[in-house]
Regions:
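Conserved C-terminal structural/oligomerization subdomain of aldehyde/semialdehyde dehydrogenase
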Residues: 44, 92-95, 99-227
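ALDH superfamily catalytic-core signature
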Residues: 1-109, 171, 219-220, 226-227
Length: 227
């Protein structure tokens, strides 16, 4: 839950790796949504220069209007805005700033607005019945930067890593904040950037394969016996 909340609301939803879609198994969707809403309501929202603040304002009025428009589109598509459809009370003290409450929206399907990057703290909740459906939903958007799965099933994790159409695919950690040091880049309409990651160094390095045997025996391939 902490990973979901951080990825959805961190930097007020204005990261390229922000969690925009939460794809939850239908059997636990109600419980998960209730916990997410409860956690988001407790987030300290305010001046980002003050210690303890976790969510600051949107960057400008245009970003706020984009968020309002996205929520209106979600409603028109049959979505239920459960929480967050308002400016935060902190905005009363700072009327020229755009502090907002993170929004949670349950959607009946993955509509065009769900597949659009708004760069605002909007979390669209979709449900699935089979892992195949969840992976298909994950991939059926124009972007392909960061994705994550939470599971205790190693086979599910391996399938997701193999089939996620994203440059970053995580297991049991959120979409945002775990990518430093690796090759950072995406697929489809998402920009590149892998040349800025540490993996790019390998293009300038010589490679050496090393096998170190710490046993007292001589291991041989293909079951060969020698002396």
């Amino acid at each position: 839950m902490r990973a979901v909340v951080f990825a959805a609301a961190g930097t007020a939803g204005q990261r390229c790796t922000t969690l925009r879609r939460l794809i939850v198994h239908r059997s636990v969707a109600d419980e998960v949504v209730a916990r997410v809403v409860s956690a988001l309501r407790r987030l300290p929202i305010g001046d980002p220069f003050e210690p303890g603040t976790l969510v600051g304002p949107l960057i400008h009025e245009t970003a706020y209007r984009d968020m309002v428009g996205a929520l209106e589109s979600a409603r028109a598509d049959g979505g239920e805005v459960i929480d967050g459809d308002r400016r935060h009370p902190f905005a009363v003290e700072h009327p020229s700033s755009y502090y907002v409450a993170p929004a949670v929206v349950r959607m009946p399907a993955q509509t065009p607005i769900v597949a659009t990057e708004t760069f605002a703290p909007i979390l669209y909740v979709l449900t699935y019945d089979r892992l195949d459906d969840a992976i298909a939903l994950n991939n059926a958007v124009p972007q392909g930067l960061s994705s994550a799965i939470f599971t205790t099933d190693l086979r599910e994790a391996e399938r997701f890593l193999d089939e996620s159409d994203c440059g970053i695919a995580n297991v049991n950690i959120g979409t945002s904040g775990a990518e430093i040091g690796g090759a950072f880049g995406g697929e489809k309409q998402t920009g590149g950037g892998r040349e800025s990651g540490s993996d790019s160094w390998k293009a300038y390095m010589r490679q050496s394969t090393n096998t170190v045997n710490y046993s007292g025996a001589l291991p041989l391939a293909q079951g060969v016996e020698f002396g």
